[in-house]
């Protein structure tokens, strides 16, 4: 009877499940992958796209003082062809140039056109001041059918000076203008190249013509070059425009004896603006700070893959269409194989048997925190998130996107338009430089994101380690690590006890005596799997030896007492 009681008690003891607490992290079967410095395609719980690909096909002008130049070219606002009459003076912080816009009416070109265009794009608008030039002995009303209003006319801001009579003498003249303003003045003038020598003589008289312009920082002489050219707008002549920025209190002087297109008013820049070239429709219902020829880029991302020539407060252009920034930890979802393994192991080791490493594996459904606990005890099983470690990781990860933006965003200016023959070389250099910058920034972007991803994954693993160490230091000798991110507790630990472990208020001294007793009992019956077979064979051999000894002893006694006779025949 006593033997039966002992066997039942031992069986009952072995069947009791040990209380256990495990640590893990959130997992989600989402397929979100990022690249790090050392590995590509690492799946993470959360990630944010850093490359903008969405374009608004409109010019978002809400909240901006916008001017749409329409048929007027930006440079035309300085010299005043008929199509620019309404834009001779304006104020704006967003200037829109259209493809149909034209800077001139009489054929010609601007010297250093792109520099002048950049100045005007950033000008904030134009205001003008009369230069006060008066003329005697010449006509100031030169006009052409190429610049028609109701009839033949000329540039509104320029004077075409002609001899008083056809073939008449053009007197030598000198005119001066002093800039009395506090800001630089934009001064522009023209040189007329007649369609023939005969035409030049008719307009300005015979002899060589020379125009000289000088200031404290500028000096240049110009000689007209008459001759036949292909007709444009019915004209075989050309007018080339030149310009300078005149400092405050400086004086510009003009000396000429014909073929001179004189300025009438000096231009002053109003402030700051953004100039764009686009045929996209204006939209006053949306706001934007980054523009390109196809519309507006509205994004708070650090990179964009829409247009390499976007201007304004824009994300950096990169060649990559996607660069994912990790904002969560490494993800190991509970796939079907994992769940089948979990079910199989639960039969042997309970709820937590499937966990093969608390950093490498996660739990789906832990949505209220990144890190958490699972426990089992006499009251059942439970899961709880750890908010402190979660918040610590989030605080360090939050702002990664903003830091990338700070490293990459800046105001871009558009250096792009038509170049004359000499400026084409400059244009090629600009384009080559731009392409090189794109290559560099595409590499930099990939590197920056990879560095941040590496840091994020290392950081989240580090927080997991901290949480694990916190639990281990609390439990001390009252529990044993099982190597799978779990602790087997050697005393009864109810839900309040489990909560104290999670809250870092666990008192290991309170349970020490019970834990030591249970540890001794458990250690006494624990057998390492490597010695089980040896012990079994030893036990079997000892049993056989004992059985043989008893049998031989009984036989010897029986023979001695005459109860058994042994006959040996030879």
Curated annotation (Swiss-Prot):
PTM info: Palmitoylated.
Signal peptide boundaries: 1-18
UniProt KW keywords: Clathrin- and caveolin-independent endocytosis of virus by host, Clathrin-mediated endocytosis of virus by host, Disulfide bond, Fusion of virus membrane with host endosomal membrane, Fusion of virus membrane with host membrane, Glycoprotein, Hemagglutinin, Host cell membrane, Host membrane, Host-virus interaction, Lipoprotein, Membrane, Palmitate, Signal, Transmembrane, Transmembrane helix, Viral attachment to host cell, Viral envelope protein, Viral penetration into host cytoplasm, Virion, Virus endocytosis by host, Virus entry into host cell
Keyword Glycosyltransferase in record: no
Membrane topology term: Single-pass type I membrane protein
Disulfide bonds: 22-486, 60-286, 72-84, 105-147, 290-314, 493-497
Pfam family, one: Hemagglutinin
Sugar attachment sites: 30, 46, 249, 253, 335, 431, 503
Name this protein carries in UniProt: Hemagglutinin
Record gene name: HA
């Amino acid at each position: 009877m006593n033997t039966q009681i002992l066997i039942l008690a031992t069986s009952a003891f072995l069947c009791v499940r040990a209380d256990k607490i495990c640590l893990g992290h959130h997992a989600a079967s989402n397929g979100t992958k990022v690249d790090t410095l050392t590995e590509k395609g690492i799946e993470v719980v959360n990630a944010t796209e850093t490359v903008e690909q969405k374009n608004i096909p409109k010019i978002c002008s809400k909240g901006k003082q916008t001017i749409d130049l329409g048929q007027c070219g930006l440079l035309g606002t300085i010299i005043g062809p008929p199509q620019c009459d309404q834009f001779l003076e304006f104020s704006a912080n967003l200037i829109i140039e259209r493809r149909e816009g034209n800077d001139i009416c009489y054929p010609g070109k601007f010297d250093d056109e792109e520099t002048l265009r950049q100045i005007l794009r950033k000008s904030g608008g134009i205001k003008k001041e009369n230069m006060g030039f008066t003329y005697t002995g010449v006509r100031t009303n030169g006009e052409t059918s190429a610049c028609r209003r109701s009839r033949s006319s000329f540039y509104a801001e320029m004077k075409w000076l002609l001899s008083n009579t056809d073939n008449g003498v053009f007197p030598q003249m000198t005119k001066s203008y002093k800039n009395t303003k506090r800001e630089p003045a934009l001064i522009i003038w023209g040189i007329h190249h007649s369609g023939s020598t005969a035409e030049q003589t008719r307009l300005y008289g015979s002899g060589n013509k020379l125009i000289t312009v000088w200031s404290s920082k500028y000096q240049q002489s110009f000689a007209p070059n008459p001759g036949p050219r292909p007709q444009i707008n019915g004209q075989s002549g050309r007018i080339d425009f030149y310009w300078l920025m005149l400092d405050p209190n400086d004086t510009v002087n003009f000396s000429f004896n014909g073929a001179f297109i004189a300025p009438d008013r000096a231009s002053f820049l109003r402030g700051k603006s953004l100039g764009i070239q686009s045929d996209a429709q204006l939209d006053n219902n949306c706001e934007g700070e980054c523009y390109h020829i196809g519309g507006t880029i509205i994004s708070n991302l650090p990179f964009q893959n829409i247009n390499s020539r976007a201007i304004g407060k824009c994300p950096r252009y990169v060649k990559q269409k996607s660069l994912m920034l990790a904002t969560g930890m490494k993800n190991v979802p509970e796939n079907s194989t994992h769940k089948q393994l979990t079910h199989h192991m639960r039969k042997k080791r309970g709820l937590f048997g499937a966990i093969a490493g608390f950093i490498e594996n996660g739990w789906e459904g832990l949505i209220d925190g990144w890190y958490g606990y699972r426990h089992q005890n006499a009251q059942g099983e439970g899961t709880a998130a750890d908010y402190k470690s979660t918040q610590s990781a989030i605080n360090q990860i939050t702002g990664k996107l903003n830091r990338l933006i700070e490293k990459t965003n800046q105001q871009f200016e558009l250096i792009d338009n038509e170049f004359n023959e000499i400026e084409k070389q400059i244009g090629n250099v600009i384009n080559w430089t731009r392409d090189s910058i794109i290559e560099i920034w595409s590499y930099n972007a990939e590197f920056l994101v990879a560095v941040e991803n590496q840091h994020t994954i290392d950081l989240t693993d580090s927080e997991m380690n901290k949480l694990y160490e916190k639990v281990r230091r609390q439990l001390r000798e009252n529990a044993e690590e099982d190597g799978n991110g779990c602790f087997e507790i050697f005393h009864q630990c109810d839900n309040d006890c489990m909560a104290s472990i999670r809250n870092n208020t666990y008192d290991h001294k309170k349970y020490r005596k019970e834990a030591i007793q249970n540890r001794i009992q458990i250690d006494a019956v624990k057998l390492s799997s490597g010695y089980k077979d040896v012990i079994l064979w030893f036990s079997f051999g000892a049993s056989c030896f004992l059985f043989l000894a008893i049998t031989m002893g009984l036989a010897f006694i029986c023979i001695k007492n005459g109860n058994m006779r042994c006959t040996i025949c030879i």
